[in-house]
Structures are given as C-alpha cells and as structure tokens.
Amino acid sequence: KQPQTVEPRSTDIFTYPLVHMTGHGNVFFSEEDAQNLRKYLISGGFLHIDDNYGMRPYIEKELKKVFPNQELQELPADHPIFSSAYNFPEGLPKIHEHDGERPQAFGITYENRLILLFTFESDLGDGWENAEVHNDPQQVREKALKMGANIVKYAFEN
C-alpha cells in the first residue's frame, strides 16, 4: 500500500494520529495551514518532521505561525522517546552524514505532552528507504528503523 499524503489545512489530517513530514528545503504554512495544524496537534495529533537536509531555517520560521509563543527545545538523551521500544542512550542516532554535525532532536510540548518532533542532522528517512537507495549498512538501517519504532510507539502511547 502506498503512503498516504495529507495537507496541513485539510480536515483529513484529523484521521491520522501521526503525520510524518520530510524534505530538503522550502516549507511554507499559510495561516489556514498553521491554524489547522495547531488544532490537530493540541487535539492529540503528533507530527514528526525529519530534516532530509536544508529544512531547519524554514521549519523554525513556519512553526512560529503554528505556535507563536513556543520555540523548538532540544530533547535530552534521556527523553522517553529514545527508549520507548529500543534504547538509544546517546539520544537520536546518526543515519546519514551530510556535514559531520551531531544529530539533534527538538520538540514542542503542549500540556506536558510532546506533540511535535523535529529530527535534525540524522536523516532517519534515509534508513527507512530501500537499501539500494543509499547503500547504508544493515546496522545503520536497523538503527533508523528502531528509532522509527520508538517514535511511533511514543506517539501512540502519549
């Protein structure tokens, strides 16, 4: 089955408990997108944004439309999302090298619930693609898949 897509402004977003977003650069949320996405997230939805490279400046700017009074906060390595199914004692694993920077996980919380996860300098999605696409070793792909399982489990349980 093909992955489903949904627009941030669509009411269909409320049928998905978890939404995954990825890309390489320019992201823009209209006011309608931002309002609907905020409503989705504070109503129980979860958004994982995986920076495939180049999204961070756009995401930081556009998330200000969604949550004008909140900043992305770096998650500590002992955050439960790193141990919900598989243990990552160092936090977010590094999957794909772009420029040698350390992987970072950022979040936005609402009423003590992590509602948005932004993974940066990790590129989990590369490890989720077919092995032939990036020629990643099996252990790298397994780390990506296990971290993905952690994200899904955490999102469904919190």
Give names to the regions the model predicted.
Residues 1-7, 49-52, 70-78:
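Surface-exposed patches in mature extracellular/periplasmic domains of secreted proteins
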Residues 1-18, 22-25, 115, 123-124, ...:
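Aromatic-Pro/Gly-enriched surface loop or interdomain linker
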Residues 2-8, 30-35, 100-104:
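Alpha-helical scaffolding within the catalytic cores
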Residues 11-15, 41-42, 107-112:
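Extracellular/periplasmic catalytic domains that process cell-envelope and extracellular macromolecules
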Residues 18-57:
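Short alpha-beta junction capping motif
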Residues 23, 45, 63-71, 155:
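Sec/Tat-exported extracytoplasmic proteins
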Residues 56-130, 140-149:
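An acidic, glycine-rich "communication" segment
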